[in-house]
Amino acid sequence: MDGGDDGNLIIKKRFVSEAELDERRKRRQEEWEKVRKPEDPEECPEEVYDPRSLYERLQEQKDRKQQEYEEQFKFKNMVRGLDEDETNFLDEVSRQQELIEKQRREEELKELKEYRNNLKKVGISQENKKEVEKKLTVKPIETKNKFSQAKLLAGAVKHKSSESGNSVKRLKPDPEPDDKNQEPSSCKSLGNTSLSGPSIHCPSAAVCIGILPGLGAYSGSSDSESSSDSEGTINATGKIVSSIFRTNTFLEAP
């Protein structure tokens, strides 16, 4: 009995009576009156019959919701315009960055200028120092050269050659300061026994006073035909004061 009653209820639900349809139509009309606009028709439109199964209709609703969700979180929909507060904030930040950059450039230029000025000062001081060092180094070299020349001339040897064959004579320093008074006269009378008559000895026109660096008094060759003669005077410090080179010229008396 119970099983038969359940079967009858299921069969009854499959069939809808005219009264139920009228009641549903009346309910839809009431709802339509609530949402109806002036341009809409007065009567509620009939429901469109959908021959699809329940599964297909549910699947369609699910797909529709998924599309709406994806459309909401797309990248192009996430981009939006900036409002006024945000633009003001960004302008302030950019202005502060420009000020900081400007200050940094000014500091760099100032440091470069100071560095160049210091380099110029150091360069000038180094040049002055080099000039002073050059002066200090040149003076000892000159004194050293003078002493070395004096030492070299102190041991110079003079060879005197004549027809009579005189011996070698070494130069010696003269203790007397007045050396010019010892210069011989312009002409001398030589009494040479080897010559037949009296003769007059006259000096040549070339007279050398002082010395040149690196030069000493050297005698001529020991040949008996050489008739040149040189005499020098050396003071107490070993420096030649005057040197007279003569050429023996023998003139017969008239």
Swiss-Prot record:
<feature type="region of interest" description="Disordered">
    <location>
        <begin position="22"/>
        <end position="52"/>
    </location>
</feature>
<dbReference type="GO" id="GO:1901799">
    <property type="term" value="P:negative regulation of proteasomal protein catabolic process"/>
</dbReference>
<protein>
    <recommendedName>
        <fullName>PSME3-interacting protein</fullName>
    </recommendedName>
</protein>
<comment type="subunit">
    <text>Interacts (via C-terminus) with both free and 20S proteasome-bound forms of the proteasome activator complex subunit PSME3; the interaction is direct.</text>
</comment>
<feature type="region of interest" description="Disordered">
    <location>
        <begin position="155"/>
        <end position="195"/>
    </location>
</feature>
<dbReference type="GO" id="GO:0005654">
    <property type="term" value="C:nucleoplasm"/>
</dbReference>
<feature type="compositionally biased region" description="Basic and acidic residues">
    <location>
        <begin position="22"/>
        <end position="39"/>
    </location>
</feature>
<dbReference type="GO" id="GO:0043231">
    <property type="term" value="C:intracellular membrane-bounded organelle"/>
</dbReference>
<feature type="modified residue" description="Phosphoserine; by CK2">
    <location>
        <position position="222"/>
    </location>
</feature>
<feature type="region of interest" description="Interaction with PSME3">
    <location>
        <begin position="201"/>
        <end position="254"/>
    </location>
</feature>
<feature type="modified residue" description="N-acetylmethionine">
    <location>
        <position position="1"/>
    </location>
</feature>
<keyword id="KW-0597">Phosphoprotein</keyword>
<feature type="modified residue" description="Phosphoserine">
    <location>
        <position position="17"/>
    </location>
</feature>
<dbReference type="InterPro" id="IPR039845">
    <property type="entry name" value="FAM192A"/>
</dbReference>
<dbReference type="InterPro" id="IPR019331">
    <property type="entry name" value="FAM192A/Fyv6_N"/>
</dbReference>
<dbReference type="GO" id="GO:0032091">
    <property type="term" value="P:negative regulation of protein binding"/>
</dbReference>
<dbReference type="Pfam" id="PF10187">
    <property type="entry name" value="FAM192A_Fyv6_N"/>
</dbReference>
<keyword id="KW-0539">Nucleus</keyword>
<dbReference type="GO" id="GO:0005634">
    <property type="term" value="C:nucleus"/>
</dbReference>
<feature type="modified residue" description="Phosphoserine; by CK2">
    <location>
        <position position="228"/>
    </location>
</feature>
<keyword id="KW-0007">Acetylation</keyword>
<comment type="function">
    <text>Promotes the association of the proteasome activator complex subunit PSME3 with the 20S proteasome and regulates its activity. Inhibits PSME3-mediated degradation of some proteasome substrates, probably by affecting their diffusion rate into the catalytic chamber of the proteasome. Also inhibits the interaction of PSME3 with COIL, inhibits accumulation of PSME3 in Cajal bodies and positively regulates the number of Cajal bodies in the nucleus.</text>
</comment>
<feature type="compositionally biased region" description="Basic and acidic residues">
    <location>
        <begin position="171"/>
        <end position="182"/>
    </location>
</feature>
<feature type="modified residue" description="N6-acetyllysine">
    <location>
        <position position="139"/>
    </location>
</feature>
<feature type="compositionally biased region" description="Polar residues">
    <location>
        <begin position="183"/>
        <end position="195"/>
    </location>
</feature>
